[in-house]
């Protein structure tokens, strides 16, 4: 490696620098500050990365997003995404898929096309230093789960934990990972996280897209539905409703099969360490369950949460006034201290 770029949470850049120098006292480091990425200073700082001979450059997550890929590469990758979703739409129409799913995919395609049109119409400034010009040949990403909201196309509907929303920072990271794969033969990106899978098994698919896109292409598993049908299945179970009253049937993508094959593929890039293997110092704890009966006021408030949830599900309340996020938040507050309900805390 000639020049390594470490992308870490914003508040940890200095801590990373101190620990890096503790391990490698003679290393030549460049560490970004908040001022370095202000509009007036950003170009100068990127020029220092491009022209300097550094062992490592340490920047924050939000600063990383401000270093653009070249417009040509962005156009090419956006067009690839559009082609991919058009293929999925054509397949759905051939299989007589649900109109709702097709419409959702067409909406996503139009959104991508709008981004592409905006990119094509933008003024090309020759003085902008692009990510490719930095000379970076290794990309290390700490707390990589912060980039888990990557675009996802699927014909599945009403499956909990299957988010098709995307974050711009995740799309940006994905494009840069693809570039790093190109120049290093798929060996230029290293993710570090304690929670690669936290809420949904689809997060494993997302990690594999970041780190094993070439492998997924070879095995025809780049599309989520192909990956899901090969390695997992949806299961429906009865669970407590979030408002705390009653139960509901919920479908989740929560069961794997062909697990040995999946893990063998994932371990081509993953070095997994459990707390037992690392012998981490964890204090012993003694748990005691104390059951406390709810007060009348709490019972009334739980009933109110249920009424609010019913109104949200029926669509008779504006989301800006009330929504399930507010309701579950109030439920958590009520669980610990009823006086917190209705307060910002």
Predicted feature residues:
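Conserved Walker A/P-loop ATP-binding site and its immediately adjacent core
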Residues: 2-23, 27-29, 36, 62-65, ...
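Structural signal for conserved beta-strand scaffold positions within catalytic alpha/beta enzyme cores
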Residues: 31-33, 291-292
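Motif I (Walker A/P-loop) of helicase-class P-loop NTPases
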Residues: 1, 173, 205
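Short, solvent-exposed loop/turn and secondary-structure capping segments
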Residues: 69, 150-153, 201-203
